[in-house]
């Protein structure tokens, strides 16, 4: 069972900057996402679950053009504060919003070039993942892209063992793993709504990450 929104907020308020310690398994997947998301020509990025702003900083430093804007949201006030400190030098190009916990993207219909979410959907219930995908489809431009990274099922002997152990901990006490569990992102994207342009799994130190880039199917 997924954590309540209040439990998630309390956990990540306490966790704070320690979230950056997960870079040892996250960075390779984030780099792969960046390499395939064609970010150099976009003008607007929305990140659902910005955390400490670590990935946003990477995008603003190395991937986005100097005219591109970034908007990020997070449920945790501590994470928003850390992201504000980290991204302050980018001035008006950056907007950070503390989420109420509702699955909502603060953007007009068909106004965003890229919707990004990394290591967040594995925290949500299946219902909330579907709601997020619906919101992402609403705000993306017709040629926009949904860019995702998540914990996923292991593909090697070691990562399969890690998956089993992680799921056991999640069932026993979700708070021990921050409310996150391995999920299959591809199973949550309705084929009538999304066309997957890129799909890859990377394993680092026994932890498997799924990378997906999808485009909205024209209606």
Mark where each language-model region is.
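C-terminal alpha-helical "lid/dimerization" subdomain adjacent to the S-adenosyl-L-methionine
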Residues: 149-192, 199-201
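Class I SAM-dependent methyltransferase SAM/SAH-binding core
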Residues: 46-103
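Short glycine-centered segments of the SAM/dcSAM-binding site in methyltransferase folds
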Residues: 44, 143-145
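A short acidic, Gly/Pro-enriched loop at the edge of an enzyme's catalytic core
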Residues: 105-115
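Core SAM-dependent methyltransferase catalytic element
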Residues: 193, 201-219
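Conserved class I S-adenosyl-L-methionine
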Residues: 1-40, 54
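A short SAM/SAH-binding and catalytic strip from SAM-dependent methyltransferases
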Residues: 114-127
């Amino acid at each position: 069972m997924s954590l309540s929104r209040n439990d998630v907020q309390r956990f990540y308020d306490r966790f704070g900057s320690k979230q950056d310690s997960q870079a040892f398994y996250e960075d390779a997947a984030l780099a792969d996402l960046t390499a395939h998301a064609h970010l150099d020509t976009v003008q607007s990025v929305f990140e659902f679950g910005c955390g400490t702003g670590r990935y946003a900083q990477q995008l603003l430093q190395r991937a986005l053009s100097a005219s591109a804007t970034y908007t990020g949201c997070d449920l945790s006030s501590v994470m928003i504060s850390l992201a504000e400190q980290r991204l302050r030098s980018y001035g008006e190009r950056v907007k950070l919003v503390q989420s109420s916990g509702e699955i909502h993207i603060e953007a007009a219909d068909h106004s965003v070039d890229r919707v990004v979410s990394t290591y967040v959907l594995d925290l949500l219930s299946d219902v909330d993942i579907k709601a997020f995908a619906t919101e992402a489809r609403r705000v993306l431009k017709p040629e926009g892209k949904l860019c995702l990274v998540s914990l996923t099922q292991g593909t090697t002997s070691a990562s399969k063992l890690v998956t089993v152990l992680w799921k056991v901990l999640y069932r026993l006490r979700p708070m021990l793993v921050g409310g996150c569990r391995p999920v299959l992102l591809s199973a949550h994207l309705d084929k009538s709504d999304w066309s997957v342009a890129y799909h890859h799994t990377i394993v680092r130190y026994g932890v498997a990450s799924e990378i997906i880039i999808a485009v909205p199917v024209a209606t």
